[in-house]
C-alpha cells in the first residue's frame, strides 16, 4: 500500500514530532513523507490532498506539527482499513480531559467526548460527527469523491466558526462517508497543557 504521511504547518515541524514520525512502524507499506509549509492549515491540507491524488497514494496520514503519534499509529489506524479514521488528542487548554471529537448524536457540534468516556468504551473505534485532524488517516478516494476545497474555514452570522477539519468531516459525511476515531491511537500534543495516557 502507498501512503503519504504529511505535516501541514505554517513554519516548521517540532523535533519531537519528527522523531515520533521517524520511529513509527510503517508495517511494510511504502510511506512517503512531506512537510507542507508556508500556508494556513486549510490550504496546506488541500495541497496535501492534491499531492495524494496526483501521486496515486492509497491513503494520506496527516499529522499536525505539534502532535506526537504513538509508534503503532499507522498499524492501528489501518486495522481494519476504513475511509476516515482519527487518532485521539487532548483538546487545547483544558483540564477537563476533553478531546476535539464530537459525538454522532450532537446536532450542533457543542459537545466533546472526554477521555473518561473513551476509557469506558468496549471496542477500539467509535463513530463521531466531527473531530480534529491532529492525527488523521484518510483514504485518497474520499478526496476524489468530494468537491474542492476539501478543507475550509466557515464563519457564520453569529460569529461562530467551523474549523477546517470539522468542515472536512461535514463534507465527507455529505458524501456518505463515516468519521471514525480509533481509541488505541492516543497522541500527545506539545501545545496542550494536559496530555492523557
Predicted regions and their residues:
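Active-site nucleotide-sugar/metal-binding loop of Leloir-type enzymes
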Residues: 46-59
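N-proximal low-complexity "stem/linker" segments adjacent to membrane-targeting elements
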Residues: 1-43
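Short beta-strand-to-loop acidic/aromatic patch adjacent to the donor-nucleotide binding site
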Residues: 56-68
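Residue-level recognition of beta-strand->loop/alpha-helix junctions
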Residues: 35-37, 88, 183
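Glycine-rich phosphate-binding loop at the start of an alpha helix
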Residues: 42, 46, 71, 166
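C-terminal catalytic/acceptor-binding lobe
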Residues: 1, 141, 145-197
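Conserved catalytic core of nucleotide-sugar-dependent glycosyltransferases
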Residues: 49, 70-154
Amino acid at each position: 500500500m502507498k501512503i503519504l504521511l504529511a505535516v501541514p504547518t505554517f513554519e516548521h515541524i517540532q523535533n519531537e514530532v519528527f522523531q515520533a514520525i521517524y520511529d513509527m512502524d510503517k508495517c511494510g507499506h511504502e510511506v512517503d513523507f512531506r512537510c507542507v509549509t508556508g500556508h494556513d492549515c486549510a490550504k496546506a491540507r488541500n495541497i496535501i490532498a492534491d499531492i495524494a491524488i496526483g501521486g496515486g497514494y492509497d491513503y494520506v496520514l496527516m499529522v499536525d506539527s505539534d502532535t506526537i503519534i504513538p509508534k503503532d499509529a499507522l498499524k492501528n489506524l489501518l486495522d481494519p482499513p476504513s475511509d476516515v479514521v482519527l487518532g485521539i488528542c487532548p483538546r487545547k487548554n483544558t483540564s477537563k480531559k476533553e478531546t476535539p471529537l464530537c459525538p454522532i448524536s450532537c446536532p450542533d457540534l457543542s459537545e466533546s467526548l472526554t477521555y473518561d468516556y473513551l476509557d469506558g468504551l468496549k471496542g477500539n473505534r467509535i463513530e463521531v460527527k466531527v473531530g480534529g485532524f491532529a492525527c488523521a488517516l484518510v483514504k485518497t478516494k474520499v478526496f476524489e469523491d468530494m468537491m474542492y476545497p476539501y478543507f475550509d474555514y466557515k464563519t457564520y452570522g453569529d460569529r461562530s466558526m467551523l474549523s477546517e477539519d470539522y468542515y472536512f468531516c461535514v463534507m465527507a459525511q455529505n458524501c456518505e462517508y463515516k468519521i471514525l476515531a480509533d481509541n488505541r491511537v492516543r497522541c500527545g500534543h506539545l501545545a496542550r497543557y494536559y496530555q492523557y495516557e
